[in-house]
Amino acid sequence: MLRLTLDMDDVLANTHEKLVNIVLNDFSTILNKEDFEKKGLRELLHPKQLSRLHKIMDTPGFFADIEVKEGAIETVSKLSGYYNIFVATACMEFPTSFNDKFAWLRKHFPFIPWTNIVFCGYKSIIHSDYLIDDHVRNLHAFDGQGILFTAPHNLRETAYKRVSTWSDVSELFLHIV
């Protein structure tokens, strides 16, 4: 079976949406929700605001209740019948995220074996045929075929095949099986 590795944040989990809601509700800002659809947080927020947001992300519980991306559960379930599915997610930047991320994955994707969940820093260690990720830096370091999942921070990137929804992922990977 071919190996398909999925990133968690902003691929399976709608982390960006949670961060935007925190900024709009808890920060002093003139920005609106539409601003965050066109540019990444690093482009829009002051460094002090980013630092504050990172502290919030490193709080136990932050990653526990993030919404699942629409269509992700159903599509990944179907894909698991044809591909060996792995999840590779970073947790070293936010060390308190490990338990929350693992519990989140077990809750929403119980059909992915715990042995196929990889917590890492640099995704160059991943040996897989495909990697779907929202960060180009992870795709650059990957030896297989990288596929960019659309997010506001990568809208200008053109070097990789792109998917924007889980329906796109389904069309790309399930039409050939």
PLM ranges: what are they?
Residues M1-S51:
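Active-site neighborhood of HAD-like aspartate-dependent phosphohydrolases
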Residues N84-F86, Y130, I147:
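A structural signal for isolated positions on well-ordered beta-strands in alpha/beta enzyme cores
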